[in-house]
Amino acid sequence: SASSLGKAHDALVPMIEDGTIVNIESSGVRGKIGDAISHGKLKGLATMRSHGGRVRAIETGETHVDIAFIGAPSCDEYGNCSGMGGKTNCGVLSYAYVDADQADYVVAVTDCLVAYPNYPAEINQTKVDYVCVVDQIGIPEKIATGAAKPTTDQRKILMAEYCTQVVANTPYFKDGFSYQTGVGGASIASTISLSKIMEEKNIHMGLGVGGLTKPMCELLDRGLAYKLVDTQDFDLDAVNNVRTNPNHFPISAGEYASPMNKGAFVNKLDYVI
């Protein structure tokens, strides 16, 4: 039960083929795992949920997590984890919050063991059973790959322009509007084109919701956005912005979009691109 499965998880394919892994739950599957599932190699079911739906399933017990392995760019000997402060920073650890809360056992996996206490901690010592130190947990430079890269595709750029015109010509486009983009090239490009109209009309974004990329963080840095709330960072500029801008806040995937809580951020969105 992973928040997402991609090329980094290709090594799991032989375990799917030999029946070691029978069922998969995730919010998305790409790479060789996606190909294996598409060709019927998974013996059981592949269940896809939204990010908020995954939180709901775990919190209600529909999905039970026996053991959670949480990659932590920095961690101390007692399990205080952060998405910053190490050599493989990823920004925030939002999708792992529910695993840390609900799993029977929690293992923090880090390549940067720091002095105790590693504060502020996104996942704190009360949730973690074991700390495992490895050579490297990831490659930050490869965060912005595939769909997360800015596009040069003219078709996607045209789509972005059309999206921007729709946004700019609706009654919701006024000072304090709320906005979220996906990570696709057209979505990223739409933020860039929208920023020009915002500047021309002196309209400010009250709330930006992420996954976040450089263009959204630039809106915050330029004063065109007032607050960003963040569940995932899709490039190194967004990763670093968590640390440098005090109006850039980590939130949990449950706060973002769980249908079972009393007030998810998605309920307050004017636009999603």
Role assignments for model-derived ranges:
Residues 1-273:
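Conserved alpha/beta enzyme-core scaffold
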